[in-house]
Swiss-Prot record:
It comes from Pseudomonas putida (Arthrobacter siderocapsulatus). This is Cytochrome bo(3) ubiquinol oxidase subunit 2. A lipid is attached at residue 24 (S-diacylglycerol cysteine). Heterooctamer of two A chains, two B chains, two C chains and two D chains. The gene is cyoA. It is a multi-pass membrane protein. Residues 24-42, 108-314 are periplasmic.
Length: 314
């Protein structure tokens, strides 16, 4: 390839990159839940602060390379130069200030966006228990006494309290349009608190590779009005399927690309029974739930000032 063709090739590369990026989804930067909005703001702030260093370095690299090129006879030549107080001050003070700012935002966001921290709201939360299976998601509504597979429905502008575990390998529960992910582990209970600021349907995925059926381990999360949610619960209660012991054992067997399933009856204790199956794994150490309670106690002083407002608009 001749040297003349290199500039033309480099000119094409940005367009190829744009073509590839056109298929990307901007869900993380266009969230529909307050937790997701707070996380997006943190990403933008952290990226902006880091670009304060990156962009000047890139610009100076290009400028210096051009200004001090061999063919530029007008460039100042100072072979004995060794020190500049102004440069030293800039390369030390600016990064230190950026690190302090990053530390401040990161510290506050770590407590503010703690997945174990319940969202501040006057509306009663909806409780949903999540069980990761091979390769499908089981959702149990303990207060409504129903269960679903690969689909959840909840009211918009209402906090949703998720308890998450696994009856298979380690997994990760993630609804990108609403907020962050949380791991699902056998014999352990993790927690996640989310809210949808508006009605809509959101994609839910497994964010942790878990075997052959991993790519099909997806579900739909639908935020509706309270009235529509009540109607949906009534419809599920009409389903002929019941999540009894035999049905659960059949469901827990590995299977791929499972369709949505609705169960009119499910024991409120089903989630805890699944966790307790692995009781021997946790013998002699505190449960994840207890550890989370201790973490919350240590950060209680910053709880009220940094709570995401449930149902707030961006």
């Amino acid at each position: 390839m001749s040297k003349k063709r290199y500039p033309r090739l480099f000119g094409i590369l940005p367009f190829l990159g744009m073509l590839l990026l056109s298929g990307c989804n901007w869900t993380l930067l266009d969230p529909k839940g307050q937790v997701g909005i707070e996380q997006k703001n943190l990403i933008l702030i952290a990226t902006g602060l880091m670009l304060l260093v990156v962009i000047p370095v890139i610009i100076m690299t290009v400028v210096f390379a051009w200004k001090y090129r061999a063919s530029n006879k007008a460039a100042t030549y100072t072979p004995d130069w060794s020190h500049s107080t102004k440069i030293e001050a800039a390369v030390w003070i600016i990064p230190i200030l950026i690190i302090i700012a990053l530390g401040y935002f990161t510290y506050h966001s770590t407590h503010k966006l703690d997945p174990y921290r319940p969202l501040d709201s006057d509306v009663k939360p909806v409780q949903i228990d999540v069980v990761a299976l091979d390769w499908k998601w089981l959702f149990i509504y303990p207060e409504q006494g129903i269960a679903t597979v690969n689909k959840i429905v909840f009211p918009a502008n209402t906090p949703v309290n998720f308890r998450v575990t696994s009856d298979a390998v380690m997994n990760s529960f993630f609804i990108p349009g609403l907020g962050g992910q949380i791991y699902a582990m056998a014999g352990m209970t993790t927690k996640l608190h989310l809210i949808a600021n508006e009605n809509g349907e959101f994609d839910g995925i497994s964010a942790n590779y878990s075997g052959a059926g991993f790519t099909g381990m997806k579900f739909k999360a639908t935020a509706t009005s309270q009235e529509d949610f009540d109607k949906w619960v009534a419809e599920v209660k009409q389903s002929p399927k019941k999540l009894d012991k035999a049905e659960y054992e059949a469901l827990a067997k590995p299977s791929e690309n499972n369709p949505v399933a609705l169960y009119s009856e499910a024991s409120p204790d089903q989630f805890q029974l699944i966790v307790d199956k692995y009781e021997g794994m946790n013998r002699g150490r505190p449960s994840h739930e207890e550890a989370g309670s201790k973490d919350l106690a240590t950060t209680k002083g910053v709880e009220s000032s940094m709570q995401p407002a449930a149902g707030a608009e961006e």
